[in-house]
Amino acid sequence: MRIVIFRLQANPIFEERRLTVKKWTWGLLTVFILVWLAVGGTGDRSEKDVCDIGGDPFESCTSILVGKLASADGSTMTSHSCDSTTDRTWITVVPHKTHKPGDLCPVYRNSKETRIPDDQSRFKSGDIPQVPETYAYINTAYPCLNEHQLAVGETTFGGKRELRSKEGIIDCPELYRLVLERAKTAREAIRIADELTKTYGYNDYGECFTFADPQETWHFEIVGPGAGKKGAVWAAVRIPDDHVGVSANASRIRQLKLKDPDRFLASANVHAVAQEMDWWDPSGDEPFEFCYAYGSRRSMGSRRREWRVLSRIAPSLNLDANAENFPLSVKAEKKLTVKDVLDIFRDTYQDTPFDMTRTVTEVSREGKASVSPVASPFMNREWMALLKVQSERTICCKAATYLQITQSRSWLPDPIGGLVWLGYDNPATTPHTPFYCGIKRMPASYMVDGRTRFQRDSAWWAFRTVSQLALFRWQPMSQTIARVWSAIEDKAFADQAKIEEEALALYKQNPAKAAEFLTSYCVKMAEDAVAAYWKLHDDLWGSYTYYF
């Protein structure tokens, strides 16, 4: 008996098709999904395979910057959706340390893919002189927040391959670590990044760092100096206080007004390297534009995310979804909360022509069409080919290792004013809980890496298993899951003011007691979320067993 008809189209601009599916096909599709999950659906694939749609392997992160006058409470915010299938899942708190004269600081390569904090498989690139003291920081795969409320997000844009140099010893994650250990403000971080890369060399791809301190937010881009050279080329633009900016794996900085150092900064060689490479002629008609000199604007997967973020922040601009360039930042038409930023990171182009679920429909016996229960914005390539769906690189990515959204607040003491809202795996299926920059430890399950094998004691797997189960029958299961994550987040947001009031009272009496109070709160909040998700995992198997 025929029970389902799919109405399929790749996009509104594509021809509509109809596909009749017999009842037994559901069984075959279920087997297909089980096999897919077993051989690679849980993440053992390249970033390009999972996230990329535009032919650029660097479509794997998104970062949003919020100025203090663009936020609802005066916070500055930065963020990073670490959309990678290889980066480590263990997270620790590295304490404040003092060092002796003559001490050296080891520099490692690719520390973001280690499996334990002291992984001996790390390749040591070299040593640099240590500073007298290094600041405490929350050590995510790309370290995110230090004890002075300096926060940083990241996206890779690659840059031109001729810029890569093997002469340097500092890669992107290590540069993150070094500036968070040594800087108190975004401007100081940029200065230190310049000094370190100038002296010891930068050896990684083109990267964007999105810095936030309690007063300012900065968009910083860096590339190598060219083969055989030691150094780096970089530029930075301050995001206006009432603006929101975005980076999505494409270079964004265009013209530099270096006579205005309050808003624009750059390396001393920013023009010279482009001239040497014949990428810019100062005597020509075209102005120098950093993104075209050292990168490109080809990736539609990047541009589409830029369009969507900025359109949600300033809808009255009516930005063209297919434009090559967008403003680096826009004035917020509504002041944003952390919850608002989270909602953007969960965006899958819903209610737009680029929503991948809108063309996968089923038709009942009565002839009524509706979205199919299996329609998902996170279908793999095989599913999209089968259902003739045009792939889009959405803001929300099923390959995420974690999403961080930081708050830095000038009116509170640093240990209370700085915090990161952190959630593992797909933002669409995961709750995000707070971790203050003054805490002393992470939950035990957050310090267990989950990349090499399934481990019940790894927090990452609690959220990963739920997000992967949801792909079987996305429409109903995602709603079930949303009820759980929204309850956890709503409680965290509702309790925030009270928790911080108690912490502030303790801080005035004894800062150490305030730190332990916040540590206990953050650890319990996270552990409760992990426990809730293991229960949800078990409940989903029972509730949807007929469909597996």
Go through the PLM ranges and name each one:
Residues 371-500:
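Substrate-recognition/cap regions that form aromatic- and gly/pro-loop-enriched pockets
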Residues 34-49:
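Bacterial Sec-dependent signal peptides at the C-terminal "C-region" and cleavage site
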Residues 485-548:
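Histidine-centered catalytic/metal-binding microenvironments
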